[in-house]
UniProtKB/Swiss-Prot annotation:
Listed GO CC annotations: 90S preribosome; cytosolic small ribosomal subunit; small-subunit processome
A UniProt-annotated Pfam family: Ribosomal_S7e
GO-annotated molecular function: structural constituent of ribosome
Similarity annotation: Belongs to the eukaryotic ribosomal protein eS7 family.
Coiled-coil residue windows: none
InterPro entries to which the protein is assigned, alphabetical: Ribosomal_eS7 (IPR000554), Ribosomal_eS7_CS (IPR047861)
Gene designation: RPS7
Alphabetical keyword list: Ribonucleoprotein, Ribosomal protein
A biological process from GO: translation
Source organism of the structure: Secale cereale
Protein name, per record: Small ribosomal subunit protein eS7
Amino acid sequence: MYTARKKIQKDKGLEPSEFEDTVAQAFFDLENGNQELKSDVKDLYINAAFQMDVAGNRKAVVIHVPYRLRKNFRKIHVRLVRELEKKFSGKDVVIVATRRIVRPPKKGSAVVRPRTRTLTAVHDGLLEDVVYPAEIVGKRVRYRLDGSKIIKIFLDPMERNNTEYKLDTFTAVYRRLCGKDVVYEYPVAETA
């Protein structure tokens, strides 16, 4: 029998939480109810999901998907997020790929750590996933006198209408995932 449990695959020995079951059920309902998304959602599943509070009494749903299915999720990202936001009654939905950080190899060992498993690469990848469908067109790091730093991310102004209302959500989700403070802006186009 095909059930919503097929839509979530956790690591061995872990049981999905109640909220993760709710998200898996939403995916299952999309596959069975929505004709335009049916064929695209059929082979997709999630790894984990959690809900978090964002400033201003809003909530965000963060869904972790397998890294190798990232491309397939990106093809239908806009439609999928719109449908999921309807199902979760106005909560912002953010889809990120599950990535792993591997510790640096010990001195003298012959093991080479892939670039994609470094902390920097994982945090940059998560940042790209969080702001998708907008593209990052620039990045500035500002160091304050007290030693703290603020990362300014410039997003593609073409996607301003689709993403501007979610900037608080993007900031809160990235802070929760990586522990870094980020400020999002849209660069002003210079007229010559």
